[in-house]
Amino acid sequence: MNNLLLSINWNPNPELFNLFGISIRYYGLLWAIGIFFAYIVVHYQYRDKKIDEKKFEPLFFYCFFGILIGARLGHCLFYDPGYYLNHFWEMILPVKFLPGGGWKFTGYEGLASHGGTLGLIISLWLYCRKTKMNYMDVVDMIAVATPITACFIRLANLMNSEIIGKVTDVSWAFVFERVDMQPRHPAQLYEAIAYFILFLVMMFLYKNYSKKLHRGFFFGLCLTAIFTFRFFVEFLKENQVDFENSMALNMGQWLSIPFVIIGIYFMFFYGKKKSVK
């Protein structure tokens, strides 16, 4: 009882307002804010490097659709393939088809960060093919901005009372009333704070050491830091799907491991290999 009294009761309405029957939710708004800040940061880097403005113009669309498609497919195929392979159009469209007929607009409720990362990496490759830019230069610039977007995405999860933490007795525990009345780790907030700090570190390194660091360093640091933290914070989270209960590590942790390995390679080995050549 004492732990419950010390906890923070959390029960915001995930819907900001309703416009002509279409629900405008904090989730979508915070996603948009995160992408907007990333847009500003990357645009700043393009101008700082004196890159042709015409090359920057299509970048937003490649990133937006790459992240959205990758994150959606990642959620559907990694976390609930049985359902979505039998409800294919719900994987593609932001609606839910009702059993009695008809449909309901829901937005894309399930988005996976690992899938979004893969989608972004692929879309940037397509962008670089079109603009003839160096791929590592572009992913480094995107990497500097990525943590601020990740921060807002986790705040979006917090407003949705989703990706909740395990039951705890810490004094800053949240009671997610839409889930139950148990005090839990605000894991979404842990990630949001960590990613915001990483963003500040990235900006500091870019402004002070970008000319001294090899190509691929920022890309590697971003992958390593985000997915290492993600791996460990998963121990404080409830599993998202039932099949994870029988796993030693959950799906988020297994998917994080290859990204950490790739990140370490680009931080410590990629530049050296290029230098030898």
Swiss-Prot record:
Localization annotation: Cell inner membrane
GO molecular function terms listed in the Swiss-Prot or TrEMBL record: phosphatidylglycerol-prolipoprotein diacylglyceryl transferase activity
Record keyword Cell inner membrane present: yes
Any single Gene Ontology cellular-component annotation: plasma membrane
Keyword Cell membrane on entry: yes
One matching Pfam family: LGT
Entry membrane topology: Multi-pass membrane protein
TM spans (from-to): 22-42, 59-79, 107-127, 133-153, 186-206, 216-236, 251-271
GO biological process: lipoprotein biosynthetic process
Family (UniProt): Belongs to the Lgt family.
Function: Catalyzes the transfer of the diacylglyceryl group from phosphatidylglycerol to the sulfhydryl group of the N-terminal cysteine of a prolipoprotein, the first step in the formation of mature lipoproteins.
Protein's name according to its UniProt entry: Phosphatidylglycerol--prolipoprotein diacylglyceryl transferase
Organism: Bacteroides fragilis (strain ATCC 25285 / DSM 2151 / CCUG 4856 / JCM 11019 / LMG 10263 / NCTC 9343 / Onslow / VPI 2553 / EN-2)
Gene symbol of the encoding locus: lgt
